[in-house]
Amino acid sequence: MPKVSIITPCYKAERFIARTLESVRAQTLTDWEHVVVDDGSPDDSAQVVQGYAARDPRVRLLRQPNGGMENARNSGFAACSAGSEFLLFLDADDCLEPEALATLAGYLEARPAVGLAYCARIWIDADDRPMEDANRQPLPRFAPAWRGARVLPDSEPETPLAALVAFHLAIPSSCLIRRSVYAQTDGWDERLRRKGFEDLDMVMRCALLAPVHYVPTVLLRYRRHGGNASHVTDLAGDRVPFARKWNRSEGLSRDQVRRVRRAFDFDRFLAAHLQFRAARERVSRRDLRKGLFFWAQGVRKTLKFLLALARREGAS
């Protein structure tokens, strides 16, 4: 049985799917299976995958009518080998670094209590070029603290639910999930199809079941391009069904309800805190400019006074 089951929903990915498949085949950990679900693609995505499946028995193609990414992920999981230990839901346009599976699987094997490990990522464009603006600074992991919020250092890998909610830190392609933890969820919520919050929804459900850890090694190349699903959704408007679902707290214990509410409270606090800090920095920069202006004026007036004084003394 494979150690890792990789599930890839594929829709209109003809341009990128070969690069994704090649990144999986380049893994130093070779004990994997890759189930690619063609979700009714109108292009030649399925033909590309079929070509790889013919050459590598670890790659399998599953075809179905278009049902959305969440439905395709659920179908892919159902088609996986029952004995795999870990799951990775890899998008059809993202690429793994060669050590990704070995690093994340090794991390979880060494820490049986951890349910999900997610890695650092770099952003690439449609032509595989790193996006310098996006990669300039990694997303901070903000966590609640007695003074409001603090940034978790890399030496503290455990990422609390509040931090995961605040910045949507863990995306599917970066997450290796322990299968026994995922099996306790209901799978991907198809009611949130194309709402922009289905990824966070799954991460939250895993985080309520077991600790989530951050591995600060870049193991994923996360692609941004005009066809990304996240680019064509209105995240502000689509938050409503996601929030409504979690406000109902169906099937959650009292402790889980408390953790979820604290996470959403922290999310709102952090948004206000960061806006206030940004406004304060703008004011500080403005005051600095004013201060430099008046300082320069003062220096100029002092020099003029000293020059005039020297002239008077020279004349006398």
Regions inferred by a protein language model and the residue ranges of each:
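Catalytic core of nucleotide-sugar-dependent glycosyltransferases
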Residues: 141-143, 210, 218-226, 231-258, ...
